[in-house]
Amino acid sequence: MIDFKVLPEALLFIAGVVPNTLFMAFVSIFFGILFGSFIAVLRLGNNMFINIFFAVFVSFFRAVPGIVQLFIVYYSLPYLLAPVFSAFSGTEVKPFDVSPYWSVYLCFILYNTAYQSENIRGALRSVDHGQYEAAVAMGMTSFRAFTRIVLPQAFVVALPAFFTYYLKTIKLLALVFTVKVVDMFAKADIFSALYNRRMEPYIADAIAYWGLAILLTFLFDQWEKKLRGKGFNKSA
């Protein structure tokens, strides 16, 4: 039987790690957008090598399950970083001394970079190229025309997908308990082990994820309305 009196206690236990989960997701999506934008701009050109290279990169992260990506990074990254850390610190750093957080961040940044590069590339292509040409014809430099005319419109087109993948990353972070990083799911698992409760902590975890999604969606909708109210719209 489910003891509903345990749910508030489990929710409070899980709530302690919510800021950490949100931060990990934010860092992942932020750098994913940053690097994805760079890749998207590069792929707008006609360089066959660049297009093939990044097409393979995107294809890999779209096809391979997140848990497999995480394990590949987790078991290989410490052996790559240990010599670097040793060189900078002047002391020997062994692979198992490298924090698993590095693996989590790298894995999810690469994951978001792959998806956001496609999202941003599509958004850039959705902007009428005639606006860019008209701006250049009026005396704007190519860079200024791109950053002042094309980029703001593409940003608004891509914005919903940014938020969608932020929520998706929050949920995917439930995988990180497998590499000894504590997130919301891991916290529920710890509660289950500590108090020998099998159902309540996971129901509380589901409520926490659901409530968080509702709150973040509301905040995003309000922010998007403000942006559109300031003239940031798809037809700008």
Residues covered by each model-derived region:
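Transmembrane alpha-helices and adjacent helix-loop boundaries
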Residues: 1-236
